[in-house]
Amino acid sequence: MNTREVELRGHIIDSLILPRALDIIMDMGGDFQILEIDIGKRKSDPSHARILVEAETPSLLNQILDELGEIGASIAEIKEAELRRAPMDRVLPDDFYSTTNHQTFIYHGGEWVEVEGIEMDCMIVVDPESRTARCKPIREIKKGDLVVVGREGIKVVPPERPRGKQGVFEFMGSEVSSEKPLVTTIKKIASEITEIKKRGGRIGLVGGPAIVHTGSAPVIAEMIRLGFIDVLFAGNALATHDIECALYGTSLGVDIDRGEAVSRGHRHHINAINEINRAGSIRDAVEQGVLTSGIMYECVKNDVPFVLAGSIRDDGPLPDVITDVMEAQNEMRKYVQDLDMVIMIATMLHSIATGNILPSRVKTICVDINPATVTKLSDRGSSQAVSVVTDVGAFIPILLHEIKKMNGLGD
C-alpha cells in the first residue's frame, strides 16, 4: 500500500473542505485514516486535521494528492518546491505544476513564498535572485525559466466560509436557480457593493450587449458616473450598441423607447462605428463632442479604464477594440488582481474569459437569464461565483435604485 500524510488547516468544517477531502479519497478508489483532528470551538478558531492517504499504486496516490491539493490540502512533511528549467520557449518541463485560482505558496529557500498574480491553469516561475514566485501562462514561458514541478512544497489556500453571516455570498450559496427572491438578492448585492466602496475597494463590470438592448445602458452609465464601477471589460458589441444608442436612440436598429424597428435602422450600428472611426477613437469622439452620453462616454469622462476584446464575429470593429485575444487578455490582467468584486452581466464569452484570470478571493456575481452561463462559469473553475438568473433589464435598474438608497443619493 502506498501512503502519504496530508494536512488541512482553517475553517475546514464550515467550508466543507474536510468532507470534500474524504469524498475525493474514497471516490478515486483510495482509503484514509484520520491521524489527528482538532476542531475550533469559537467562531474565530481554525481547525486542523492530519490524514493518512492510502492507495494501491503510486500513480493513483499522486492523482489523489493532486485533487486534494486543489482544495487546500498540503503534504504534511515540508520539502522544498522542486524547480526545473524550461527546455524551450513555451515548452514546460515534465510533471509541471498547474495552478488553481486560489492563493498559493511555495516552500523555497527555507520559507513560504506567496505566488504573485495567481490565476488558474498557469505555471509557477521562480526568480532565485529576488526570491519571488509568480504565475505565468504557458505562452510566456521562456527557455531557462525555473518552473515548479511535482507536488512537494506547494500550499493552496482556498477561500474559507467563516462562521457568521456573509451577505449575498451566504444567501446565494445554493445551486443555480431562477427561483430566488430577486429584490432581496439585489438588496444584498447592493449592500456588498456599498461596503466595498466605503472601504476603498474596486469593482469591475463585465458587460454584454443585452445591457443596451434592454434599455439599461443609461443605468450602467449612471453607476459609472457615481463611482461604483472602476473598470469595464466588454466586447465590440456592447461598445458599438451603446454608441449607437447614444447617437441614434436605437440598439440593433430598434428604438429603445418604443421597442419598434426604425426605417433603415439596420445601418445604425455601422454608422456608429463609422463615426468613431472618423473621430479616431472613443476618447476622441468624446473630446470632439461627437459622443455625449452612454456607458463609453462616462468611462472616458470619469477616467474609468475599459478593455474591449474582439471576437471573430465582430462588425467593424471599433478602433478601441483589441483584436489580438492574447493582448486583450494581458490588458485585462493589469486590473483583475486589484479588484474586490466583479459583476458579470449577460455575456457568457467575456464572463468565462474573465473568470479564467480572476483570483478566487475576488467576489463574483454572474447575472444572466440563461442558467447555462452561470453553470459553465462554475464548471470552468470559477467556483466562487454566485448566480442571479434573471432578465438584466429588471436587475440593473433595481440594483442602482438600492445602491442610491443605501448611499443617500436619492433616486
From Swiss-Prot:
EC assignment: 4.3.1.12
Family according to the record: Belongs to the AgrE/ArgZ ornithine cyclodeaminase family.
UniProt name for this protein: Ornithine cyclodeaminase
Needed cofactors: NAD(+)
Catalytic activity reported: L-ornithine = L-proline + NH4(+)
Alphabetical list of Gene3D superfamilies matching this protein: conserved putative lor/sdh protein from methanococcus maripaludis s2 domain (2.40.420.10), putative lor/sdh protein like domains (3.40.50.10690)
Organism in which the protein naturally occurs: Methanothermobacter thermautotrophicus (strain ATCC 29096 / DSM 1053 / JCM 10044 / NBRC 100330 / Delta H) (Methanobacterium thermoautotrophicum)
Keywords assigned: Lyase, NAD, Nucleotide-binding
Signal peptide from the UniProt entry: none
The keyword Zinc-finger is assigned to this record: no
